[in-house]
A protein has these predicted regions:
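RNA-interacting cores
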Residues: 1-175
Length: 175
């Protein structure tokens, strides 16, 4: 097992799905969708099971590592920031009653935004194979709190690197 840090660059918008109401200047309430956050309200959170189900799909496409992907564990906190100004949120347009066009705002990662995720990968999956698995996830599934099946959250893999030790050095001296 080894811990890896994966950097991803979004190719389509990745939209938040946590519905909250905000008031405009006229005191009217509007629904706005935010990214899910860690309990302390800080980092953006992507559920580990989103990654797991997408990796299972990628393993089927690759026809390799069908069992081993069950051993991949993802940290739920995402290393990435969005623009917190609601005026800059993504506008998702849809048809209202009749032919009128409406929109709702989503906090989002936009194409070109880069995030980092940490995961633990079994030794039986090589770095090259893990890259290929993540590439399939990014091109065909995506990762987005709001409707990845509608094409949101597609990405390209930028880098995969071993995560530096967090608790001291690998060269530990004992007395």
């Amino acid at each position: 097992m080894r811990e890896l840090t994966v950097r991803l660059s979004f190719t389509t918008n990745c939209l938040g799905d946590v519905k909250k109401y905000v008031k405009d200047a006229g005191n009217k309430r509007w629904p706005v969708y935010f990214m899910p956050r860690m309990p302390n309200g800080g980092k953006i959170r992507f559920q580990a099971n989103w990654w797991t189900s997408s990796l299972k799909y990628a393993a089927k496409v690759m026809n390799k590592h069908l069992r081993e992907v069950n051993g991949v564990s993802f940290e739920v906190a995402v290393d990435g920031r969005t623009d917190s100004n609601i005026d800059h949120f993504y506008k998702r347009h849809f048809k209202g009653n009749g032919d009128e066009s409406k929109f709702v705002k989503h906090e989002a990662f936009f194409p070109g935004d880069i995030i980092g995720i940490n995961c633990v990968v079994p030794g039986s999956i090589s770095d090259d194979d893990f890259w290929t698995l993540m590439d399939y996830v990014g091109r065909f599934r995506g990762i987005s709190p709001y409707s990845p099946t509608e094409g949101y959250g597609r990405f390209e893999v930028v880098t995969i690197r071993e995560t530096p030790a967090r608790h001291g050095s690998k060269d530990i001296s004992r007395r």
